[in-house]
Amino acid sequence: MNNQIIKINDIELANNKPFVLFGGINVLESRDLAMRVAEHYVEVTTKLNIPYVFKASFDKANRSSINSYRGPGLDEGLKIFEEIKKTFNIPLITDVHEPHQAAPVAEVVDVIQLPAFLARQTDLVVAMAKTGAIINVKKPQFLAPHEMRHIITKFNEAGNNNVALCERGSSFGYNNLVVDMLGMDDMKVMAPVIFDATHALQRPGGRADSADGRRAQAAELARSGMALGIAGLFIEAHPNPNEAKCDGPCALALSKLEGYLTQMKAVDDLIKSFAPLDTSASDL
């Protein structure tokens, strides 16, 4: 297992440390909603003593339909991020889609996310690496876990060694994702691993013009991932998931956040209390 520690301000992200929550809302729908969601996450994570990084997107550039809501855009999004950071004194994570976005985002945001569909775009990788920001790489649905080494190497060769990997499911036929738990465990050899338990619930293209999801199984899937002993958990919640402008079918209801995280913390604490157990030996 890779026990590299990535420092996000005073937070330690590592496979053998207490898990870090990367949580928030899928896309910035409005300033007021983002502030409300951030405040609730801060209250719950403070109560449960869970290290916390706020997540939202300023632009959803890969929507199924050209008519789908994308977000407020870079400039307005960064203003909202700055207010959240100043108000709650928390680190932030967001995704970028084009090389020119990397530098301005890194001036405000602590962790930059490389989207799964863009994970092999070398120009984007290099631009992100050069900011010196912490990087979260979403594993593409179409790549094997061992292939993530190549993406890490790109970042390293471009001068950035603070790279985490994020599992979000693998394509399993049409309109379906499955999570390869052994594959996620294999990635722990390469870097700190984060589990995106929200987007792993997706049924891509499952609706006429958007993705469907399996919110009812959010706790089951997340508990399974936490049982691997990982560095972080990535989730999205919404006050009214059925009214969310993106990925509502996968989002947790905000009112369920405390109970959900209480379970995840209990699993993480239990798993990381065990002594290492080597089952590779073949002797009797």
UniProtKB/Swiss-Prot annotation:
InterPro entries: Aldolase_TIM (IPR013785), DAHP1/KDSA (IPR006218), KDO8P_synthase (IPR006269)
E.C. no: 2.5.1.55
Known catalytic reactions: D-arabinose 5-phosphate + phosphoenolpyruvate + H2O = 3-deoxy-alpha-D-manno-2-octulosonate-8-phosphate + phosphate
Native organism: Pseudoalteromonas translucida (strain TAC 125)
Keyword hit for Cytoplasm: yes
Cited Gene3D superfamilies: Aldolase class I
HAMAP family: KDO8P_synth
Subcellular location, principal: cytoplasm
Name of the protein in question: 2-dehydro-3-deoxyphosphooctonate aldolase
Species lineage: Bacteria, Pseudomonadati, Pseudomonadota, Gammaproteobacteria, Alteromonadales
Location in or out of the cell: Cytoplasm
